[in-house]
Amino acid sequence: MNIFNQLKQDIIAASQKLYNNKEIANTATIETPKDSFNGDLSSNIAMIIASKESIAPREVALKFKEVLVTLPYIASIEIAGPGFINFTIKAESWQAAIKDILQHEEKFFEIDIDKNSNINIEYVSANPTGPMHIGHARGAVYGDVLARILQKVGYSVTKEYYVNDAGSQINDLVSTVLLRYKEALGEPITIPVGLYPGEYLIPLGEILSKEYGNKLLTMNDVERFKIIKSFAVEKMLDLNRKDLADLGIKHDVFFSEQSLYDKGEIEKTVKLLERMGLIYEGTLPAPKGKVHEDWEYRVQKLFKSTNYGDSQDRPIEKADGSWSYFASDLAYAKDKIDRGANHLIYVLGADHSGYVKRIEAIVKALGQEKVKVDVKICQLVNFVENGVPIKMSKRLGSFASVQDVNKEVGKDIIRFMMLTRQNDKPLDFDLVKVKEQSRENPIFYVQYAHVRTKSILSKARELMPEAYNSFKEGKYNLSLLSSEEEIEIIKLLAAWTKTLEASVKYFEPHRIAFYLINLASKFHSMWNFGKENSDYRFIIENNKELTLARLALASVIQKIIASGLEVIGVEPMVTM
C-alpha cells in the first residue's frame, strides 16, 4: 500500500460523502510535518472545504476526523492550528510499505497525475561560438533531469536546443575563424578585442586552409561569409553536442534560428499576429533611468505583449528595418506549437530573467491561452578551486569549460552537485569538496550509502546463505522493524513517490537530490549505531529473523537510492 496515495483517495471519498464534492479534494495537500509531534502526515483539506462552504475550518476538520479515524491504517487523528488534520499511521502500515516495494516495485513507483500534455522543453541553447563553459552546465543538468522525470512519469517530452546562429556573435565567430584561416596560410594576425582569442578556433582555420587553399581570400564577402559561417557553426555545434553527451545529455531537436529567416517564418508569424490585431505602429516610452531628452521616440511596429501581462509592448523591428530578436522568438514559439506542443518550458540563465514576462506573453498570444508556458531561471554557479574563483569568458580565451571540469571530477559529480540547490538560488561548486570522501560531500555520502547496502546483501549471502535465500523468497517478518530509527527510515522510503510527484508538479528536480541526501544520512546513522550497539546491525548471525527483516530494509534502501540516482542521470556505484 502506498500510504500517501491511499490517504489521498480516502480524503477524496470522505469529501464526497460529507460535502458531495470530490473534485475540491484533489487540490488538497498531504505533507510530512516538520515536527514529529504533529503526526506522520498532515492535510489542509478542512481549510479548503471551509473556504468554499463558508464554515469554520475546525468544524470541517472534526467531521473528517469522524469518518477517517476508523480507517484500518490510522492510529490517531488530531486537529491542529486553524484546521490542519494530522494523522498518525500505524507502524504495521509503514512496515507494509517495505513489502509493497519489494513485491510490487513497478506499481509502487507509479504516479497518478494528468499526463496528457505534449511538453517541449528548451534548455542550454548556448551560442555555438566555442566549447561550452561550466556556467551552462547548471541549466543543462536542470533541464535534462526535469525532462527525464517528466518522461519517467509518462509525459511525452521533446528536448530541444535553440541554435542561435543568426546573431551578431556568429558574425564575430566568422571574423575570428577568417583570421585563423589567414594565420594557417602563414599571415601574421592579431585578434581584435571583441572577437574570440581562444586557441580552439586554430584547427578550424587549418581545416579551411587545407580544403580551400587561398581561394576564400579571392571570393566576394557574401560567398566567403556563407561558407565560413556554415562550417564554423556546424563545428561548434559538434563540439557542444560532445560536451553535452559527455554530461549524459542528448537533445531530440537542434533548431536553427537562421531557418526561421530562410523559410520566411517570421513574416508569416507577424502577418498572423496582424490579423489577430496584436501588431500596431507606435512609440515606446524611454527606458527607466534614461533622460527624456536623450531618448529618440521612433514610430515602429510593436507587439501588444501588455495584453498578456508584460510590462511594455515589444518592438518586432530594429531601427534599420531588420527583424528584432523578439520577432524570431515569436516565430520560434509558433513553430513549437505547430509541431504539436501544448506545454512549453523554457530553461534560461540568470542573465535572461528579464525575458520571463515577454516569453509568457508570446506563448499566451500564439497559443490563444490554450498552451501552457513555464519559464524557469537557473541562477549562477560560483565555481571555485581551492577557494579561488575561475574566470569564465570565451572572449578572454580563459574559462573553465564543461570539458575541463568533466575531466577533473566526472559527469556524475557535476550532475548531482548542480541539483544541490534550488535552481533559482546561486550555487557554490567547490572542486576540492566534491572529491572528498566525507559526509560533507553529498554525492559521496549518497553513493557510499548505495555501496554499503549492496555490501550488506553480499555479506549476508556469504555469511548466512540460508537466511539470504529466505529473504529472496520473501520470508521475513517486517513487524520486527520497530525501532524509532527503522520506522523513520521506512517513512522516508514510503515518501519516495511523493518526492518524485512534487518534483514533477513544481518542476524542482533538486527535491530528488535533497531526498537522497536525507535518506543516506538516516541510513548511515543507523549503520553507525550498529558499530556501537550490535542490536542495530543489519546482519546479526545469532538472530536470523531480525536479520531477514533488515535485509529487506537494506534492499529497499538500495533500490530507491538506485532509482533516484538513475532518474537524475547518475550511475549508482557498486564499489568504492
Swiss-Prot record:
GO terms for molecular function: arginine-tRNA ligase activity; ATP binding. Its EC number is 6.1.1.19. Belongs to the class-I aminoacyl-tRNA synthetase family. This is Arginine--tRNA ligase. It catalyses: tRNA(Arg) + L-arginine + ATP = L-arginyl-tRNA(Arg) + AMP + diphosphate. Keywords: Aminoacyl-tRNA synthetase, ATP-binding, Cytoplasm, Ligase, Nucleotide-binding, Protein biosynthesis. SUPFAM superfamilies: Anticodon-binding domain of a subclass of class I aminoacyl-tRNA synthetases, Arginyl-tRNA synthetase (ArgRS), N-terminal 'additional' domain, Nucleotidylyl transferase. A motif ('HIGH' region) lies at residues 126-136. GO terms for cellular component: cytoplasm. NCBIfam families: argS. It comes from Rickettsia prowazekii (strain Madrid E). Its main location: cytoplasm. One of its GO terms (biological process) is arginyl-tRNA aminoacylation. It comes from the Bacteria. Monomer. It holds the Pfam family DALR_1. The keyword ATP-binding applies. PANTHER family: ARGININE--TRNA LIGASE, CYTOPLASMIC (PTHR11956:SF5), ARGINYL-TRNA SYNTHETASE (PTHR11956). It is found in: Cytoplasm. It is an enzyme of class 6 (ligase).
